[in-house]
Amino acid sequence: MQQYPDVRQHRPFGYWVKEIDRRIEEMGRRVLAEHGLDRRLWQVLNTIASGPIGPDDLDRALAPFLSADEPTLRPYVDDLARRGWVSRSGEGDLTLTDAGRDAYARARERMYAARARVVEGLSPEDYDTLMDLLERIAGNLGAEVAA
């Protein structure tokens, strides 16, 4: 029979997963707000920064984040275009303007610095082990849900 740690001495696994998620979300929200962005605007900006992309391809690339209430990212593209950060080619492809590239670079630098703080103190081996364990746990849960 599996032995479980005494929750009076160690908080349960689910507590830490939720707490880490909450803290990462809050950190990202604060960093992006410094640049006038929210998570969805950042995802759109980050995707367009990878190279020209059509609006339909952008929706497909970020489809996991869309819903019946939010079926397209066009309102976010329009917001970025109003800021002068995104332009549309004659074919409709979206690209970052010079101002958009500058804004993206500033936000990206802050996001990367924040992400580095998340894993500060972990060796590359620790990080690889953590990622492997989380992936295996997710796989276990996926198998359990499918059963």
Task: State what each model feature region is.
Residues 1-39:
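N-terminal leader segment of winged-helix/HTH proteins
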